[in-house]
Amino acid sequence: MGTEAEPPSPPSPPAQQQEQANPPVWNAQNQKPARLYRLVLFFIAGSLTAWMFHAFSSSNLAWKLRQLHHLPTAHYLQTRDEFALYSVEELNAFKEFYDKSVSDSVGASFTEAEQTSINEALVSLRMAQDMYLTGKDDKAARLFEHALALAPRHPEVLLRYGEFLEHNQRNIVLADQYYFQALTISPSNSEALANRQRTADVVQNLDQRRLESLDSKRDALSAIHESNAALRRAKKEAYFQHIYHSVGIEGNTMTLAQTRSILETRMAVDGKSIDEHNEILGMDLAMKYINASLVQKIEITIKDILELHRRVMGHVDPIEGGEFRRNQVYVGGHIPPGPGDLALLMQRFERWLNSEHISTLHPVNYAALAHYKLVHIHPFIDGNGRTSRLLMNTLLMRAGYPPVIIPKQQRSKYYHFLKLANEGDIRPFVRFIADCTEKTLDLYLWATSDLPQQIPMLIQTESEAGERLAQMQSPNVAQRSSILEFYESGSGALP
């Protein structure tokens, strides 16, 4: 039998014939979707990888920011968001600068003199601890203070002195401040971190109670009618005092009597420079502007701040008054932003000043922060301190507080707390402003009380203080003395 022939295959359809005739073209067309699919997968995978890397970097950066004082984050002040001085945008803008500052400070080497001071401080520290263990607390305290004076930024000195203050002196606020400083210098210091975790909440509660006490005194003062003659006299005296002390902080040598004479008679004082006269007249113009206009405004703008500065400097330097500086300036160890950055920084400051966020701040905290932020930017060639203090008092007055007087005798402490704020902890400066606020409230309340003799608002010299105290007949001499000592001693500590 022969093999059966296979039936012929049916003819291919035209489409199949075309596909068989051109197989390479069909394969290329079939591979295009696969290649596009792979590109999409690669893009998604790359995006996820980039996102994960960014998330890791952000979390790592956030950890660093919480530990380092150079970056003003929420950790900047009691880890509370409302105290952060800068926005996230500002943090990103300044990150490179701060990272360089940290690396420079870590890699800095000590001079021979500095190393000698550190070695001596560590010897004093060991002796202080020995004295403390043997119950000689007074000697231990002096040795701790000596060690701190020799090495004020040594983590071990800050840590041990803080522990002594916390457990022996019961000064938990100052101890917490030193723990904070130790962490800013040595972020990985586990002892300092543990100590601060123990004290932070306690100190925060103490600060809150202090602010509530200020509110109570403010309310008591607000309850006194404006027609009260003693209140009117106190306000007039406080006006002279405010100008005298504010220009005195900047180095003006006029006495209180001379300041009052210039403001009341507009007559020159022999032996004093024209600039010193003009500084007083400029402050007078600025305070009248605040009382007549600024304190009633809902929002304070850059224009308002420029107008305030224009009056402060109007008699001293009318060309620079109300104008941003055009040169770089240096303020001690602080290097303010360059003139090219001032417009942007002041716009951000204006937004912060009028943001809804500030409604969560206590008025004293808000005013102190505004003071610090403006003086930190340092937008003017001169008059920054006076303008910042005037702005602070404007904000306090809008909240029902009287203008706060920062005594010129407290000048060194005032600048020291500003320096601590630049180094990362603004709380001591806020507490200092709270101290001054309380003393000012006490003086107003005392002046309007039923005591037979009113307490003097402020005293210029120790001899004058002694003379006034001898004239007082009130039985509560101790409290009178404590208020006077605040303005005379230079400690600024509350009794």
Swiss-Prot record:
Coiled coil: none annotated. Residues 300-435 form the Fido domain. The record marks E250 as: Important for autoinhibition of adenylyltransferase activity. It is a single-pass membrane protein. It comes from the Eukaryota. It is found in: Membrane. It holds the Pfam family Fic. The chain crosses the membrane at residues 36-58. Its EC number is 2.7.7.108, 3.1.4.-. The side chain of Glu-250 determines which of the two opposing activities (AMPylase or de-AMPylase) will take place. In response to endoplasmic reticulum stress, mediates de-AMPylase activity. Adenylyltransferase activity is inhibited by the inhibitory helix present at the N-terminus: Glu-250 binds ATP and competes with ATP-binding at Arg-389, thereby preventing adenylyltransferase activity. In unstressed cells, disengagement of Glu-250 promotes adenylyltransferase activity. One of its GO terms (cellular component) is plasma membrane. Homodimer. Belongs to the fic family. Protein that can both mediate the addition of adenosine 5'-monophosphate (AMP) to specific residues of target proteins (AMPylation), and the removal of the same modification from target proteins (de-AMPylation), depending on the context. The side chain of Glu-250 determines which of the two opposing activities (AMPylase or de-AMPylase) will take place. Acts as a key regulator of the unfolded protein response (UPR) by mediating AMPylation or de-AMPylation of Hsc70-3/BiP. The fido domain mediates the adenylyltransferase activity. This is Protein adenylyltransferase Fic. It comes from Drosophila erecta (Fruit fly). The lineage of its organism: Eukaryota, Metazoa, Ecdysozoa, Arthropoda, Hexapoda.
